[in-house]
Amino acid sequence: RMGGFPIVALGNFDECSSYQIVEGIYNSVITRDITKRHNITNFDLFNRVVKYVIENVGKTFSANAIVKFMKGEGRTLSVETVYNYLEWLEKAFVIYRCQRYDMQGKTVLKTQEKFYLADASLKYCMLGFNPKSIAAMLENIVYFELRRKGYDVYIGKNAAKEIDFVAVRRNERLYVQVCRNFPEASEREVANLLEIKDHYPKYVVTLDELAGGNINGVKIVHLVDFLLAADY
């Protein structure tokens, strides 16, 4: 919940102090690296877009969806402005874009992307802790671990089914589903992977301490074991 910024992770701060530090980092990046550099005058509107993205970590959405949401709040902005905001947030390393990959057509899609946060503490600092957000933040952790290991990471679209992550590194590939509690989601998570007709590794990563083993070639692993694995 307090994230991995070095000053916080290596320090001995309570939760309140940690979030104050994270808030300072966020405000510094937003103020110095984005709003001033790009001459953003409506800071409140920009900040609301940022919060929308943070609220929807791990969910697919489009620039049009943000425009419609803002319209519902009585605010007006263009799709082009949203694209600019997202691009600037990426360049400031606040968010990271994860595109969808059509596994049948073998093409990268340009719509309904997901975004992940550079550090989980940004979500909890700005929005507070909500147990319902744990699953999305698990995805956030797995996404960055795959990136750290050198994979290009995509959302998998296999006909009408979604695979949380398709990770590609040179001639290697693996498929990953992420779920908080394995027994509750096991049928859907495993079934989606079993529909992929190739022999690349397939994983379900979970926080369930009792989960483990192999279901028809799909490996069930705890998050900690997945993070500590030298390779897959």
What kind of region is each of these model predictions?
Residues 156-157, 180-224:
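Catalytic cores of nucleic-acid endonucleases
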Residues 223-232:
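Non-catalytic C-terminal interaction segments of nucleic acid-processing enzymes
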Residues 5, 9-171:
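Accessory nucleic acid-recognition modules appended to NTPase machines
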Residues 2:
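Internal, well-ordered alpha/beta segment that forms a basic, Gly-enriched binding/recognition surface
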Residues 176:
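Conserved beta3 VAIK motif of the Hanks protein kinase fold
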Residues 127-129, 188, 214-215, 232:
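Short conserved micro-motifs at the rims of enzyme active sites and ligand-binding pockets
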